[in-house]
Each structure stands twice: as C-alpha cells, then as structure tokens.
Amino acid sequence: MSDHDPHRPTGDISDAQAFDMPWAGQLSFGRAQTHRRVDEIDLAIVGVPYDIATTNRPGARSGPRAVREQSSLSAEFSQGLWPWDHSLFDRHRVVDYFDVGYAPGDTQAMLTNVIDHVGLLVKAGANVLTLGGDHLIAYPVLTATAAVHGPLSLIHFDAHSDTWDAGAELNHGTMFLRAARDGIIVPERSVQIGMRTPNVTHGFNVIHADRFFAIGIEETLAEIHRIVGDHRCYVTFDIDFLDPAYAPGTGTPVIGGPTTWQARQLLWGLADLDVVGADLVEVAPAYDAVTQITALAGATLAHDELYLLGLARERRQAAPR
C-alpha cells in the first residue's frame, strides 16, 4: 500500500487544485482553472451576478456563486459527467472567467460590460456558457455572440416566453422580442419549450408545457431539430422551466413543469446541433430548499450545456475548410 498522500505540501500551488473533497478547494465552475487570457480558452464560463430586471422576487444575483458551489461535486468524476463518455477537461481548455462586474444598480453598465467581455471571448474563438443572474443577461450575451456567428436560432427552456411587448423597456421578460427585432435571433428558426404562462408567439415556435407532456421527449426533440436544422444556435435555460418541486429557488416559479430527468434528456438530445453559446439563469438561492436542490439542478444542467458547446466545437473544427 502506498504511503503517498496527494494532499501533503510540495511547494507547488497546483496541488491545491487536486482536491478530491467537493466541500473544499477553489470555487470555480467544475473546478476549472481560472484566468482571463482570452486566447488560451476554448470553453469559457462567465458569471453575471445581476437581478435588477426581475419582475417578481430578486435574488438571482447570487446564482452564479451557488451554481459554482454545487458544480464542485460533478467535478470529482474524472471520467466526466454521467452519461457523457468523456471529460471536457481532457479535450478542451475549460476556464472559469469569473464574473462580469458593473456599478451596482446600473443596468446599462451591465449590458455594456457583458457585451465587451463576451465579445472578447467569442472573437478570440471561445464558446461561452453564462451563469445568471436574471434572464436579461442573455440579451447582451446574444448580442456579442451574434456579432461573430450571425443571427442565431434560440432554443429556449422556460415557463415564460420572455417576449412581452413593452416598447423600449428591457427587463427579464422582454429581451427575446427585442433580440428578434434587433435581428440577433431568428424567430422562425427558434423554439421555446415549457411555456405555461400567457404569451404571444411573435413568430416564435412554441411547445407549451401541456403539449410537451402530450408528445413526450422524443417528438419534442424531433420538432426542435426540424425547426433549427443546421442553423447555429444558442441554448438558454431558465431554471423555472422545471417544476418548483425540483427548483423552488427561483424568482418567478410556475407549477406544472418538467422534472430534472426530463430536462437532462432534452439537453442530451441537442448534442448534434451547432450550439455556439448557452446560459443557465434565474437560480435564486435565497428561496432554495435547505438541500440546495435548485442550485444543484442548475449546476448539472449547465454542465450538460457545456458538453453541447464542446461537441459542437469539435465538429466545427473537424469540418473541411
């Protein structure tokens, strides 16, 4: 039996990253390395701790930290997150870029700073997974991503359509209509899944919750593929897509939603699409159960989204130029 203990001091700070204890060590997403050298990043995790645009209860500003904390557990499985057959860290330079700052209370500063930071990453060739924060943070991320990849298909998991027509107002319920009007996303090549609140489609393809439950996972995925096709797409996941039994810690919960198992199956089914960006938003830990099930769900689903980005990236790199 070896007497080697990997936790004994060696004088090398890299030992601090070798923890196999999920309750200790660095608080980065999946224990990814952390830096801001944009030319040395393939897959970037970016937090946007913002919740000023909420219309119900705030608290999503604490979402990125809570999701990172819960992601430490999945990082312990060196072979990768089940059921994926590989570790992202073996095939990509995965980096937690940490959070985009802004002057407290200044929404315009948040929008500008997110566009600047995500723009730097995307222009350097990285694919970005963003952790919110309320759902408005998707708007500047989409803006920066579309500036490089062109108008995008949106694959939107949510209890709300976020397409209210409020004129020039931007909040966490209006930004996708604004993005469509700005030419950032293409409604007819986009699909919204899980809606269970009143909405006007504004040209988006919508699979309401009742229809999702009626047709099931397989047909829902088939419909998503028919709509999106080979178009470059962005996956946005509001945690209130889930039923509050699985995700109570969010600002605008709506009963009658899918389970975490159904959500993961849906994300796995997108593995062959050309996903260039993604987000996980609206985790508000102040309302979470003591077991932190919402943050755990968010961390796991965000990790699945990171796999979508990695797989699509590999296919683009392998394609003939």
Language-model region placement:
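Conserved alpha-helical scaffold segments that buttress catalytic/binding sites
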Residues: S2-R321
